[in-house]
Structures are given as structure tokens and as C-alpha cells.
Amino acid sequence: MTQYNVTGMSCAACSARVEKAVSRVPGVTSCSVSLLTNSMGVEGSAAPQDIIAAVQAAGYGASLKGAGKAAPSAAEAEAALEDHETPKLKRRLLWSLGFLLVLMYFSMGHMMWGWPLPAFYTDNHVAMGLTQLLLTVAVMVINQKFFISGFQSLWRRAPNMDTLVALGATAAFGYSTYALFAMTGAQVRGDTEAVMTYMMDFYFESAAMILTLITVGKMLEARSKGRTTDALKGLMKLAPQTATVERDGRELEVPIKQVQRDDIFVVRPGESIPVDGVVLDGASAVNEAALTGESLPVDKAAGDTVSAATVNQSGFLRCRATRVGEDTTLSQIIQMVSDAAATKAPIAKIADRVSGVFVPTVIAIAAVTTAVWLLLGQSVGFALARGISVLVISCPCALGLATPVAIMVGSGLGAKNGILFKTAASLEETGRVDIVALDKTGTITAGEPQVTELLPADGVSEAELLRAALALEQKSEHPLARAILARAQADGLTADEVTDFRALSGSGLTAVRNGQTLQGGSLAYVSTAAEVSPAMRARCEALAEDGKTPLLFSENGRLLGVIAVADVIKPDSPQAVRELRNMGIEVVMLTGDNERTARAIGAAAGVDRVIAGVLPDGKDAEIRRLRERGKVAMVGDGINDAPALTRADVGIAIGAGADVALDAADVVLMKSRLSDVPAAIRLSRATLRNIHQNLFWAFFYNTLGIPLAAGVFVPLGLTLNPMFGAAAMSLSSFCVVSNALRLNLFKLRDPKHDQKRRKKPASANTAPAEEKTTTEKEKKPMKKTMKIEGMMCAHCEATVKKALEAIPEVVDAEVSHTAGTAVVTLQSPVDDAALKKAVEDKDYKVLGIE
């Protein structure tokens, strides 16, 4: 996705106009415009100059972010988010208020409260009117932006919020000016009664008040919008500006842009680590809270990786740079949060559709309102006041901001806690999952076997047993051997030398130590050389039932004991599973392990269902079957789980560390904590609730406000002065943004208020997984080949694949962006229109289906 800065947008109608204009450019496959960040993301083969020209033709400005680079630097991105509007609006507001207060004194102070006026104005109604006109002109000149933008947009037949304000203020000013000239004529004729009548028709103060109040609203909105990007700007400020590198045997402090890959850099206590790297020398505790949300420092020593913007707290570190510039973990996180803000959530389509026709509809309603009241015999002033009220109370901004402000705050809050949502759609969909499928290794468990128990035989000490095991296992490459070596190292043991070492495939190990034959391995293997008591055999069976691997060791036919090794469950896994289940989510564990081990791990973790003995391609098939029963999130380490992560409705990569750009995942969790999964779902649900509240307020406000402004409730004695309409319009956007900012107070790790989602009833024809598999094999599959335009990368393939496989009749979809095709395997006939719609809803073009 190529990103652009867009200038000149003032409301949702503007962003809709830009999006529509760019989408028409040949070669553009998708376009998403963010009013909140004044940015635009474009995918496709169209040249940047063509896209910029299209934006300019629509009446707005555009520039390529980062001077053509795919990802702008942190400094450039921070500058783009800098709040330049609030200071300008503040100056405009102060000048406007100064003239408005004087205008209100002349127009209402003397008449309503008897405030004194200069003698010159006594009975000089024309002078009074001219003074009000000049003061109003001053306010209009100060706020000329509304008129320039509004009438230019109207001329281009793409009216926006500024158009409504400009029309309302112009109508009030124009009618008041007419009344002033008419009053002047009446005064020349000596018609005192007509003079007073026309003077009551002055709406100069309404025109000035409308402009001033809208400016108040714009300033509050700009200030609040600035706060929604605080999390993102906070991340950008973490980026160090300099680094201390070794050059020609000397330490030099250089700008961060000059650090290159494989440079050697040093970090002293209290300094921020400048780039991603690997520790060569030294040891320290590093605070990674800025990137992962982890409050406790992490110990680092030679061979460990470090990330940019984390803080070295205690020791001296000498490191080699591995990722610099835009490739660092921090830069990727910033880019991911920016991309999420630049994309649109599916729920935003409702507001987009309304925003596209909102302003023209409001203008039409205002015109009809004015005409109807005139036909009903009301005065021009009364009818015009109703029409102006309709114009100034209507607020497309509240609709346009309802979704993006909540997405920005939600994604920023997630980033601060080590939870990264790649797109707005992933932030929305995560909270809607019904089933969470968990990979076992590295997700539920630590992913590294550990010694859990030492069971020495009678007359043998634990140290003796472990020393014999160490002597055998030191030459083995087996993962279980590494667990024994780690335990021996922790206990301070050193390995004895052995000879005649042999590894017997599938059985165990044998070697000679000090003339004594050592054997180690499975019960079946060791029992051929040493006598194993029934009690020890029973203990081995019990260990196996618990999902542990019992390793037996003997010396010259004498049993030394048993060492139990297992991939242990992470401390937070059972609690995380409980939280998911309390949310009403079914938890399934997928693993390639044997049934017995898998059942033991599943029982310890507390999952609802265990599916064992599945390879990566088997996980893909299982996810497809699970999706028949609801929305599925697949949680894995992103290494061998890529097919399943892609197949699921939401792919969550856990423990990604520095690899935050995993293509297959929709959500990336920086830490290896399963507890971040319910936290991500909790945050998604809170964000979705916030969006619903914002949309409800925006629709409710306009649904109630427009009829009130039009005078529908006049028979009940309720009318709305245009000034109050402008005040309401100003507050509506402010309320929406303020509500979104409440998300910053949300405690995403607190399960206290978790609610269960209502699950969709299973369809009557949904068979159990085993029956479904049989049915699919019995049917002869049908295939269709789709020609698709607009796919550019593996991510495009994944998007199209997921869209097609969401159709119940589709068994599989093989997508190639290089060939521009999707080969769809069907279990039953499906209409071509359904296939086409699924792809084109994702903004790709279907050229044909065979």
C-alpha cells in the first residue's frame, strides 16, 4: 500500500469525494481515505502522479509520503500527525469572538437589556444596521475558508460541510442586507412602522454566530482528534536520534540515519537502544515496555536480540546492528498502526454510503423547508430561519468520524500493550470470533522441552542420575537432549567423557563411560538391558498419561532412574483459556502430537476440544471445518501455521517478537503470552461498542435535529434558532471524538465485565467434523477458474482466498497473483455472481469465470 498526505478535507463528504476520484484512476485496485489522519492508502499499479492529479482535480491537495518510499520515516510520520490546525483555529476564534461580542452588544444588548449606545445611534436605525453589517463582514472575512471551500465544492458538484455553513451564513447575511436596504428606503419615506418591521428581520448576528460557533466546534474537534493519535505520536517520539558506533577503533556519535546494517554500536546504562541488533558482549537488563507492554526488565546477554527504542537499564552492551531505518521493530510497529488507521473497517461502509449523499440531501431539505413555510403563509424571515437552521444543524462530520477515531484510539491502545492490529477490519473482526483454535507448541506450551521430574532408583542420587544422562545426551541432537543439558547446566554439573557413542533410531542412546556401559531412552529399549520394577513401570505410564516423556537410564544393567521431560504449559495459558470460555468462545487445541499427549495438555489447559495428529496442511482443513460453525481465530507462532492463519477469519501470531510483519497474520502479539489473546478480543469488542455508540449518536442527532430545525415541531411550540443549530453542530463532532477517547481508559486485561456473545444457531445441515469429512470425499469436486485483476502480492492472495473460502460451497481456493487466477474447488454448485461478488467486495476486479 502506498500512502499519501491529503490536504483540504473538512468532513466525511470530502474524504468520500477523494476516495471516489482516486478509485476512478486506471490501475487503482483499492483506495482508503482517512479524514482523521489526513492520509490516503492506495493499492494498484497507477502512477503516483496520476493519483495526485486526480486528488487535485477533485479540489484537494496530495503528496506522496516519504518521498516515494513505501514507509515514511518516524520523523516524517510524526510531522504529518503534528496538529497544525488548532493554533490557526484558535487565532480565528479569538478574532471572531472579538467582533461577535461587539456585534451582539449592538444587535441585542440595547434592545433586550437596555444597554447604552453612543448618542450617534439614537433613533439612527440605518447607522445601527450598517454597523452590524460591517461587523458581520469582518467575521466573514476572518472565516473566509468556509466560503472558499464550500462554494468551490458546490461548483464542483461535490458539496461538503463547509458548503452547508457557507450557504447558511450567506443566506442569513444576504437576507439581512436586503432588509437593511429596505429599511433605509422606509426611513427615507418616513414609514416608521416598516422601519421597525425590517429591523426585526436582521439576522446579521446569526450569520456571525454561526461562523464563530462552527469555528469553536472545529477547534474542539481538532484538539480532540490530536489526542486520538497520542499513542502513535508517543511511539514515534521513542525513536532515538543518535547512536554511538565503532568506526576505525573509535566510538563516534552519529545521526541514526547513518547507522548501517552490521555496524557495531554500544549502549551504556540509561541509554535507548538505537536500532535492532544482537548482543556481542556485555550483559544488562533491558526495559521493553515501550514495545511490548512488559513492565519487568528482560535480561540480555551475548547472543540475545535487542530492539530499537528499548532502554538499557544496568550494564554495558556492545551489539551488531541487524535491522536499521524502516526495518526496525519500532518502525514496523509505527507503520502497522498507521496502516490500520489508513484502512477502513467494514462497519464504516454504512457511514460512507450516507456521507456520499448527505450534504446534497440536506441542501434539498433546506430548500423545500423554506418553500413550504412560504407557501403556508409565513414571513420570509421565518421561512428563511427554518431553512438556515436545517443547513447549520446538519453534521456529516459526526458520521465520518464515528469509525476512524475509535479505530485510531483502539489500535493505539493495542500497540502500547504489545497487540498490533494490521488493519481496521482485523480490529473489528477479532471481537466477533466464536471459536479460537490454538496451536499447542509455542502457544499453549513454552515450545521448549524441560525436565519436570527426576526419579532416581533406589540407592541412586538425583545428581548421579543426571550426570549419567548428561554424559549420554551431550552428543545427541534430539530436542529432549537439550532439555537435559539445560537442567544439568543449571545444576552446575559437567559432562563426563564417553566413547563408543551410538544413537539407535527410535530407541535410545548407548555409550561407554569409564569402562561402564550407559544406556538411555524409552522404557522398551532400556528394559532389555536392565530390570525395571512394576512400580517404576507404572510411574512411567502415569507420566505418559500426563503428556510427559519418560526417559530411562541404566549403567551395566542397573537401572539408574527416570527423567521426565515435557513441553510445559505456560503459566498464563490456563487462565487465558478460562477467560476465553467465559467470553462464550469455544477453545480448540490443534497439534501434531499423539492423542495421549495432546489430551493431557488439553486437559491441563482447560480447552473445550482437542484435535491431535494434524500436520500444517491438516490444520488448514480443520480450520475450514470449524468455520462452518462460526467465525474462527487461529492462534499460532506464525512459522508452520501460515496456512491455518490465512484460512481463519482472524489470524493471530503470538510471540512474534521482532517479526511484526508476518504476512499470514491479521493480529500480531509481541509477547509469547496467551493472555494477550483474550485481551485483544476484549479490546476489539470495546472498540466495536464505541463505534456503535458513535454511529448511534451521529444518526440520532441528525434524525432528531433536522426535523426540529425544519419546524416540524412548531405546532408544539418548539422552534430552533439558527444560532442554536450551529452550536449543536459544533458539539456533535466533539461528542463523537470525546466518546472515542474514553477507550484510553479501557482496561483490556480486566475480565470483570466480559460478556458472552450470542452464537448463531448451527445450520440444520451441518454435520459433525468426522461425518463432514466423509461426505466431502464421497462427492466429486467441481472446479472453476477465475481471472482476477488487481492482485499484487501474497497478501492480496490471502485476501482473495479468505473471501472465496467464506462461501459455504467452496472447499478450497488456490490463488496466484502472478497468474492472476483463482482455481476454486466446489462441493456443490454455486452461482458465478456469488463468486464474483465475494472477490469484488474486496476491491479486486473479476475479468471472467470458466
Q: Where are the language model's segments positioned?
A:
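Flexible metal-binding regulatory segments at protein termini and peripheral loops
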Residues: M1-A127, K225, R250-E251, S331, ...
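Juxtamembrane coupling segments of multi-pass membrane pumps/enzymes
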Residues: T2, M183-A186, T192-E193, A208-P269, ...
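Conserved ATP-binding TGD loop and adjacent catalytic N/P-domain core of P-type ATPases
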Residues: A16, T29, P269, V433, ...
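Conserved cytosolic catalytic loops of P-type ATPases
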Residues: V25-E43, P48-Q49, F202, K233-D327, ...
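Transmembrane helix-loop-helix hairpins at the membrane interface
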Residues: K88-T242, R353, P722, L748
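Membrane-embedded alpha-helical bundles of multi-pass transporters
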Residues: M112-V126, W155, G174, L413, ...
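Conserved catalytic phosphorylation-site environment of P-type ATPases
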Residues: L291, I350, A385, A398-L472, ...
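P-type ATPase nucleotide-binding
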Residues: V451, L455-I585, E595, V607-I623
